[in-house]
Amino acid sequence: MPEQVRGDDNAASIGTLWQFGKFRMADFGDMLQWVEVKLMCPNNPVGTVDLLMGSHHGLAVSNSAALVHALRPKATIINNGERKGIAPDVARIYRGSPGGLDVWQMHYSTMAGEEFNAPEQFIANMKQQDCQAFAIKVSARRDGSFTVTNLRNSFTKTYQP
């Protein structure tokens, strides 16, 4: 786990918890691992969430197992870039989550390679798309169910409460 870095603004990141009826989503911005662990241990004050926005582009300085595993999300969306994010250690943490979650990515990650990227249908932007950009859309319902859609290929998955 990374040591506390003095003067790093990421250590001052705030986390947000969004709720719409029974649907719950968390976003911890660029929060660093040591802050995540301090937040979640020894007791998890957040509880579980349905959807987690992956922290810090999926970099290994964030996305601790203490946070991801305690939240038990059904899905996560990682706002990575083609050359930034989805560190192999982070991919292992998400794949090992007790919630059995799906990982959705904004971009195919050259850093992660074939082994650690999500399956193609879960990736909004593949390699070298000639400046085309696609989004990932989330539609949440008050009953706690939600649907995630990859706007590049119209792949959709609905998660139940």
Which residue ranges define each predicted feature?
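Core dinuclear metal-dependent hydrolase active-site scaffold
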Residues: M1-L51, A124-P161
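Cap/insert and terminal regions of metallo-dependent hydrolase folds
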Residues: G7-A11, G29, Q33-Q129
